[in-house]
């Protein structure tokens, strides 16, 4: 290792738009943050990531949420409002990776947040889609948020 590389992490300079919730996706993007990536997490209002409500809670903060979302910047938007979707799409133009774990592709497709839609303005985009049950299985419509 060169002296100039000392302290540098493998994902330094990598920008990630985090559209994940609960555990599986949030764990992946937390590891990216630990490896130096700049993570912007966009949560769905009014409560944000449902993981915020999981025990143990102290001083109105969930230990689960803090553990799996440390090192990230976060904002909360109403994904049913067009102006909120435009903010997310604008963020997606300037990132290297978009991460999501909704399981059901139509949730993001109907909002224009799927890979095909986002790559129109960011052709080099890497789209990380975490699906517990896979996209081509009989259970592909079932939600799943745990580690895989």
Which role does the model predict for each range below?
Residues 1-148:
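N-terminal helix-loop segment corresponding to the beta1-alpha1 unit
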């Amino acid at each position: 290792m060169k002296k100039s590389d000392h302290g540098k992490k493998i994902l330094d300079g990598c920008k990630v738009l985090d559209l994940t919730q609960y555990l599986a996706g949030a764990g992946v993007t937390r590891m990216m943050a630990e490896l130096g990536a700049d993570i912007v997490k966009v949560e769905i209002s009014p409560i944000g990531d449902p993981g915020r409500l999981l025990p143990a809670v102290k001083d109105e903060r969930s230990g689960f949420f803090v553990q799996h979302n440390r090192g990230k910047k976060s904002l909360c938007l109403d994904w049913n409002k067009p102006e909120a979707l435009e903010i997310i799409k604008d963020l997606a133009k300037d990132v290297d990776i978009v991460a999501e774990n909704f399981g059901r592709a139509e949730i993001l497709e109907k909002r224009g947040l799927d890979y095909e839609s986002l790559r129109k303005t960011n052709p080099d985009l890497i789209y990380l889609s975490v699906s517990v049950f896979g996209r081509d299985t009989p259970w592909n419509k079932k939600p799943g948020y745990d580690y895989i």
